[in-house]
UniProtKB/Swiss-Prot annotation:
Residues 427-476 form the Chitin-binding type-2 domain. Chitin binds at E70, W71, G97, G98, W99, N100, Y141, M210, T211, Y212, D213, W360. Interacts with EGFR. This is Acidic mammalian chitinase.
Amino acid sequence: MTKLILLTGLVLILNLQLGSAYQLTCYFTNWAQYRPGLGRFMPDNIDPCLCTHLIYAFAGRQNNEITTIEWNDVTLYQAFNGLKNKNSQLKTLLAIGGWNFGTAPFTAMVSTPENRQTFITSVIKFLRQYEFDGLDFDWEYPGSRGSPPQDKHLFTVLVQEMREAFEQEAKQINKPRLMVTAAVAAGISNIQSGYEIPQLSQYLDYIHVMTYDLHGSWEGYTGENSPLYKYPTDTGSNAYLNVDYVMNYWKDNGAPAEKLIVGFPTYGHNFILSNPSNTGIGAPTSGAGPAGPYAKESGIWAYYEICTFLKNGATQGWDAPQEVPYAYQGNVWVGYDNIKSFDIKAQWLKHNKFGGAMVWAIDLDDFTGTFCNQGKFPLISTLKKALGLQSASCTAPAQPIEPITAAPSGSGNGSGSSSSGGSSGGSGFCAVRANGLYPVANNRNAFWHCVNGVTYQQNCQAGLVFDTSCDCCNWA
């Protein structure tokens, strides 16, 4: 459908859009600040024009209320959400949970209606206070790892209650509704024991499928972190450990394709080979490979650490059946993703009409561009280009010519009016509204633009009307 899309305050360009845009969701981890040297990553290192959604990992829980974890989370929140001042289309979410968080805090919280209500109330207050646009659940996993079977249903109940509370709160304060998303399992047994897929999908805005960590040193043989397809020798449950099978399992069991977001890892799993001369897929291993100098995690290398491994003479191979690379040197073997595999997966994603890509994590890509000689954020940039987001607008909130605010003293009139015309409005319209665009009553050609509580009125070009379904100027 041809639309005229608003880019900045009064600037409109003709943009041909075919269907809805893909999501490119990137996780930021609040422990990346502790990596040494060039590995240290802060919110200021994020390119605000790279991803459509950013998720801050992680928040914690205390007394059934959401809390900070790191000593400087509040400061980091400010910088993280401040990125929206450079990209008016960017959405930010806060994730709660994670692998190390475990299941017990979630189990306790969902166990009673009172506990759930306490949590939901705290989440709304917390997200509004720190200017996030939504919450991402990272419960690993309902019904597994010590979580009782009833948590499968109670997770649905929690998400439903939270979605309904978000809708009610948005109406009460006349702000855009907070989003609710979830990072979900890729292991079939964890999916079956953890999620009521059709019901859960009804209430979640997006479902971030963690299609990585599919193989690792815990298995005792080499394997790819995030293979697109199964390996020819994969049998039994091993045949399920690939992106294609997992994503289609979610879709075939009741999740709408457009809500399913495919997980992309910017890291690899490394191994110690039992026999350095046996370097193929499925070769015996004796444990996790060495920690890298920056991520400092045994068995895992950031993409930029893998680039150093390759530069130092490692042999690179291509796992053709699974469409992903691997590399080895001496007794160390690593399975990972690169630009080629990211592009192949992105084309597959589009062919299957999934909703977009999710990246774990933005701080593990070569964000400085100094390790891989492929520019900054080479992997995520590959996704951005492949998903057609390369030309998407990235502009700061508009600075209109004349804001609708109280006139300076001595000007002789009560309140200004926009030089772009439109129906009259007062300075109080945006005082209780989130940043964004809003329709003007009785004037379809005009719209309000709220920026940090200040009200601006702007008009669409002649013949166009403001369309709330896309926050754009559209044909009447």
